[in-house]
Amino acid sequence: MTSHTHAIGIDIGGTKIAAGWVDLASGNVLQHMQTATRAERGGQAVLDDVVGLVQSLISNRASHVSPVRIGLGICELVDLQGNVMSDFTIAWKDLPVRTILGMIAPCSIESDVRAQALAEARFGAGQDYDPFVFVNIGTGISSCLVQGGVPFAGARGNALVLATGPISVPGAAPFVLEEYASGLAVSKRFGVQTAQQVFDAAALGNTQALEILQSAGHALGSAVGWLANVLDPAAIVVGGGLGSTAGIYWGALVGSTRAHIWSADTQKLPIVKAKLGSDAGLIGAALSVCRQTL
């Protein structure tokens, strides 16, 4: 094989860190490693875990995989130069992350939603649509417009914060979308540790769980419908842990999205699930190396 055919992709989310060698021509993940994020330990501890994963992947790599390059996607604001500009979840804003990882190999840093969107554009559900809006629903909520196969970052890298959209529901004070419709939000509203527990309860007919999932999907759909009105995409691709679910949450999301789109023509746009699953983030992070370091 020739050089520059593989890269290490790392996807840092609020719940887990996934890493692996990625074949850049096919998107296949050749090796896969994972650990819990445990962001409450502090940014340095998370960075130490990432360094450990990278070193393990390098030591176990196939002989033909050379040179080493690292692409990292993180659930924070990342500017156009690859600097982490927020510390909402992972406290890396004031850490020299690229310098530390750069001592191992050339490194690029991208927002996780843009990395996921890039992967879906290249190898997943976005291949047939241009432009498309990618919506990630996991521990948090974010979005990205992809046009010509390229995720739109905005002038400063901040064009992703769908989570901050204001939401109003009867009998409650206004709040932001992520506090109501994300995986973390639905678990808190139901008083459990994970969103999966809410889905499990809903599957057993628990009326509170059903109401929480339906209202969350409806709230998110109102925001996604607004995006469709503003951007007029060819399709909406939905990824992340909650984005892969079926049932009442998905049904409410799709129904509410279409109900909040003004144009009758746009109301018919495809709303599809992402194809790459939990590997999308690390695949896209690896692909981002080609855009930032070559």
At which residue positions do the language-model features occur?
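ATP-binding/phosphotransfer module of carbohydrate and carboxylate kinases, centering on a glycine-rich
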Residues: 1-69, 78-81, 99-105, 121-133, ...
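Short, small/polar residue-rich loop motifs at catalytic or cofactor-binding pockets
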Residues: 15-16, 138-140
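Short hydrophobic alpha-helix segments
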Residues: 32-35, 88, 155
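A short acidic/small-residue loop/turn micro-motif
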Residues: 36-38, 158-161
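A charged helix-plus-loop insertion that forms the helical arch/lid used to bind
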Residues: 83-93
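General beta-strand structural signal in soluble alpha/beta enzymes
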Residues: 107-112
